[in-house]
């Protein structure tokens, strides 16, 4: 019967033939150091997180992944700001090695002071540090963002204006068609009224016959005049609608006839 590895034993999990932790501990000689390193990483990354990180790589790379995770965790505890990369860059990699050895022995890791961690411990390229982003970049990003917002607002305003113009043009066309229909109807009414007025004027302009004058030769003379002269006040004016045209003729003798045309 095969015994479980030191990593699975401290994690209290079953160890099988294809265990992913067993090959990761092959470079550590002492069983106690293997157990201490596994417990330290399980506390730093979490048990499930540690297993996921190890299983993310192939079998031949898992020992290197375990060692890299151990050095990164120790470097982050020693220098919380720059981690193991800052210790390597500043020439203090020995501090990270000492922290790894302390973990394997089960001893606590010593953290450097905050002032020492911030002065000369990180790489000179400040673009990789989120605390040293230049204000120009921020202003440029803000400017680009503001221009994008302005463009979006102008496009939206243009769309709204085009829609409003279309609606206004449609309303004007409807009003124009309505006005045209009303004007057409008013023209018809005006034409009808004009015809009635013309008919009334035609009736008023009826020829008026004056009493015929008989000459001595026996001929009848008719005096025809248009009703354009001012009407005398002595005569009674009859309304146009009540006017009737009538012809009366009387003959006293064979040579004398009297014809009257009355309205």
Curated annotation (Swiss-Prot):
Disulfide bonds: none annotated. Expressed in young shoots, roots, stems, leaves and flowers. Residues 3-109 form the LOB domain. Transmembrane segments: none annotated. Residues 169-178, 190-200 have a biased composition (Basic and acidic residues). Residues 162-204 are annotated as: Disordered. It comes from the Eukaryota. One of its GO terms (biological process) is cellular response to hypoxia. InterPro entries: LOB, LOBD. Belongs to the LOB domain-containing protein family. This is LOB domain-containing protein 41. The lineage of its organism: Eukaryota, Viridiplantae, Streptophyta, Embryophyta, Tracheophyta. The gene is LBD41.
């Amino acid at each position: 019967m095969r015994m479980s590895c030191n990593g699975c034993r401290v994690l209290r999990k079953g160890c099988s033939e294809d265990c992913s932790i067993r090959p990761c501990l092959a470079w550590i000689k002492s069983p106690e150091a293997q157990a201490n390193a596994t417990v330290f990483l399980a506390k730093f990354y979490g048990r499930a997180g540690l297993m996921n990180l190890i299983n993310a790589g192939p079998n031949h790379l898992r020992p290197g992944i375990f060692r890299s995770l151990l050095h990164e965790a120790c470097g982050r505890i020693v220098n919380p700001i720059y981690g193991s990369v800052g210790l390597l860059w500043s020439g203090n990699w020995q501090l990270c090695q000492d922290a790894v050895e302390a973990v394997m022995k089960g001893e606590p890791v010593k953290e450097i002071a905050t002032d020492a961690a911030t002065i000369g411990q990180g790489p000179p390229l400040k673009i990789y540090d989120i605390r040293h982003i230049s204000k120009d970049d921020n202003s440029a990003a803000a400017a680009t963002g503001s221009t994008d917002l302005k463009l979006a607002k102008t496009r939206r305003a243009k769309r709204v204006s085009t829609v409003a113009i279309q609606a206004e043009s449609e309303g004007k066309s409807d009003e124009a068609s309505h006005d045209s229909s009303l004007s057409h109807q008013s023209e018809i009414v005006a034409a009808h009224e004009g015809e009635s007025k013309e008919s009334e004027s035609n009736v008023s302009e009826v020829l008026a016959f004056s009493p015929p004058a008989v000459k001595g030769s026996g001929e009848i003379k008719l005096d025809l005049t248009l009703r354009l002269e001012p009407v005398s006040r002595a005569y009674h004016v009859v309304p146009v609608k009540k006017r009737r045209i009538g012809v009366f003729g009387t003959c006293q003798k064979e040579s004398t006839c009297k014809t009257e045309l009355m309205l």
